[in-house]
Swiss-Prot record:
Belongs to the ABC transporter superfamily. Energy-coupling factor EcfA family. Signal peptide: none annotated. ATP-binding (A) component of a common energy-coupling factor (ECF) ABC-transporter complex. Unlike classic ABC transporters this ECF transporter provides the energy necessary to transport a number of different substrates. Its EC number is 7.-.-.-. The keyword Transport applies. InterPro entries: AAA+_ATPase (IPR003593), ABC_transporter-like_ATP-bd (IPR003439), ABC_transporter-like_CS (IPR017871), ABC_transpr_CbiO/EcfA_su (IPR015856), ECF_ABC_transporter_ATP-bd (IPR050095), EcfA2 (IPR030946), P-loop_NTPase (IPR027417). PROSITE patterns: ABC_TRANSPORTER_1, ABC_TRANSPORTER_2, CBIO. GO terms for cellular component: ATP-binding cassette (ABC) transporter complex. Keywords: ATP-binding, Cell membrane, Membrane, Nucleotide-binding, Translocase, Transport. Forms a stable energy-coupling factor (ECF) transporter complex composed of 2 membrane-embedded substrate-binding proteins (S component), 2 ATP-binding proteins (A component) and 2 transmembrane proteins (T component). This is Energy-coupling factor transporter ATP-binding protein EcfA2. It is a peripheral membrane protein.
Amino acid sequence: MSIQFNQVSYIYQQGTPYEFEAIKNVSLTLEQGKYYAIIGQTGSGKSTLIQHLNALLKPTTGSVNINGLEVTNKTKDKHLRHIRKEVGIVFQFPESQLFEDSVEKEIEFGPKNFNMNLKNVKDKAFQLLLELGFSRNVMSSSPFQMSGGQMRKIAIVSILAMDPQVIILDEPTAGLDPNSKHQVMSLIKKIQIEENKTIILVSHDMDDVARYSDEVVVMNKGTIVEKSNPRNLFNQKTQLLKWHIELPKVVKLQKDIEKKYNMLFPKLAMNEEEFVKLYKEWHHEE
């Protein structure tokens, strides 16, 4: 399913002395099956933008077309049930939203609200949990006896198991150890590729943005200032400084080596594996 923003603006507390325009005249198309990253400083409008993707927020002006349904400030909630099933959001620190006394009950909660087949959902959740390193008795375990990182994984799986077409992740790996972070991000990329899902990642981690995303949307002061593939984006050092966006570590390393040896690699590496290959090829030529 595709999602299209048409000149969308959103104002918090409109008509009061505290009104604030969080996003301004945003037009954006998100295509089925792609992995998008949305980046920008805190306060740039990222969270407001993603809450329009399944109509948790409705535009103050403009419209959002979600799989053919035109959402405006006049759209009634009763028309949005299907959209909210097909567009799943994992909010920042989702573990704070857990409340059931077993993983199984936690997994069942969302699907019950949408009258989904619980066996299918639980089977899918169980396989995902095994891929994330849980033991086979995980479904009967209490989330509240687990570490913060394990609770985060449970919360993420509870959304993935409902099989939404669009998966939105707001800082999903914040606070996770490196191994857990790799497990989660690799699983999400696998789901995108194998199941043709649309992934929308909000992140301050430029290493993840470079490694996993197909396209990057840059927000600044409530507007979209750039939409590009990560390789092109991270070549724009001057603009990135202006937007207060860090380079990925591997890009910094490559730039340092190019400067030190007064040379240029044929392309910008987006992950460590790419860089090692480029470096070996260059070193062999030398």
